[in-house]
Amino acid sequence: MPADHIPALALAGPTASGKTAAAFAIADALAPRLPVEIISVDSALVYRGMDIGTAKPTPAEQARVPHHLIDIRDPLQAYSAAEFVQDATRLIGEIRARGALPLLVGGTMLYFKALFDGIDDMPPADAAVRARLEAQAAAIGWSGMHAELARVDPPTAARLAPGDSQRIQRALEVWHVSGRPLSSFHTTKTVAASDRPMSAASLFSLEPHDRAWLHGRIAERFHAMLAAGFLDEVLRLRARGDLHAELPSMRCVGYRQAWESLDGLYPMSSLPERGIAATRQLAKRQITWLRSMPQRHSIACDAPDATAQLVQAVRARVWGGSA
């Protein structure tokens, strides 16, 4: 049975840090006494048909240890941090009721932040408003949309780059739906600390001491994805006819760069370089977020015994001296 003092554990890290393999190592180490079920904390893995570019666990891997929040949305749909918190909270309760330990694994730091800190009481996504904003962006560009955001919500515009289309769109959507700037929602949370499903004290992280090590793995993985048919995967998604470049699913790292190349905005020969560069930038943001969480238990993922260190730390957290 899971320890009462630990409702769940979390494993975070930048892309290509080895989270999937580490999660299986944790599950194997605890299995003799405590079964584990994995809750994905990844905004790309929620989408069906996006397998290669997301490094989605294979069906065999998902059968080996139960996985949740994978393949739960069509790429045409959105999936918000608020929906994630609702789903993850429900799953944590259900998994514990089965006598297992929930292990939340991923790199979408916005989801972890919402889970640990509570979520701002913002309005839900509005498809009609988003469609109008996308049409406006097609006419004036995202730099023009950024200027519009600066008019209605200067603090949010100041922290967003003019090319950050996804966040600019969301900020303008909040303004149009609620009549309030996004920045005004950042002072209150809807969930009290005592009611949150878990805290950052149960967060383990994989972080490289040598950034070059991670950069090498990112490059190796992107080239492997291309060799595995990633571009064909994007072509199949485009062939549906109902997807476009501004959807959250198609803004995922790798997919966005592939879509741009297929649109002729960049030479196809530049796709590996641009995809790797975008993935490195994502990893940099992920590491920055992790380092802002002083309660985390950090493991150097580039250490030769990283997996052994992680398993030992997890066992100590779960069972203390009885590990």
From Swiss-Prot:
It comes from the Bacteria. Transmembrane segments: none annotated. Its EC number is 2.5.1.75. The record marks T108, R130 as: Interaction with substrate tRNA. Its cofactor is Mg(2+). Keywords: ATP-binding, Magnesium, Nucleotide-binding, Transferase, tRNA processing. Residues 42-45, 166-170, 251-256, 284-291 are annotated as: Interaction with substrate tRNA. InterPro entries: Dimethylallyltransferase, IPT, P-loop_NTPase. One of its GO terms (molecular function) is tRNA dimethylallyltransferase activity. It catalyses: adenosine(37) in tRNA + dimethylallyl diphosphate = N(6)-dimethylallyladenosine(37) in tRNA + diphosphate. GO terms for biological process: tRNA modification. ATP binds at G13, P14, T15, A16, S17, G18, K19, T20. It is an enzyme of class 2 (transferase). The keyword Manganese does not apply. Monomer. This is tRNA dimethylallyltransferase. The lineage of its organism: Bacteria, Pseudomonadati, Pseudomonadota, Betaproteobacteria, Burkholderiales.
